[in-house]
């Protein structure tokens, strides 16, 4: 496999997972709002969440971050109840157990492959910030997650 082919394949497999239109999500009716969860509540996470909320087609219903203060700050800003705010390295897994249509991954890049794979495994659509991974094994994990998401009609 050439580097060019790898990059093209990885990019194509992830691209479909980043487009979240209500009419494409299984079970979502036309003009209905998409329930999303945010993984990573730092500055960029709150910024992208604000864009989703301002768009009007999304409800931010769950949050996860390693740090409690970040989750609480974002929860207060977006009106997410305390019982839908999760903390710790694996707090995002509790978020994935919630009734969500999609997740927005804005955590540090070295967590992206594992979090995206777990989100696809949980049947969620994924919007993942770049860089999607920091090494080749992470890129391969993302590529495989994209293939699984396509096979399961998640993108």
Give the residues covered by each predicted segment:
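N-terminal secretory signal peptides and thylakoid transit peptides that target proteins
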Residues: 1-14
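C-terminal segment of N-terminal export signals and the immediately downstream linker at the start
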Residues: 19-56
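Short, well-ordered beta-strand segments
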Residues: 35-37, 64, 133
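NAD(P)-binding Rossmann-fold cofactor-contacting core
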Residues: 57-77
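Short acidic-hydrophobic, aromatic-tinged amphipathic segments that line or gate anion-handling sites
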Residues: 84-89
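Short amphipathic alpha-helix with an adjacent loop that forms part of the alpha/beta core around
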Residues: 92-98
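N-terminal Rossmann-like NAD(P) cofactor-binding module of classical short-chain dehydrogenase/reductase
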Residues: 102-104
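Beta-strand-loop-alpha-helix segment that lines the small-molecule cofactor/substrate pocket
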Residues: 108-109, 113-155
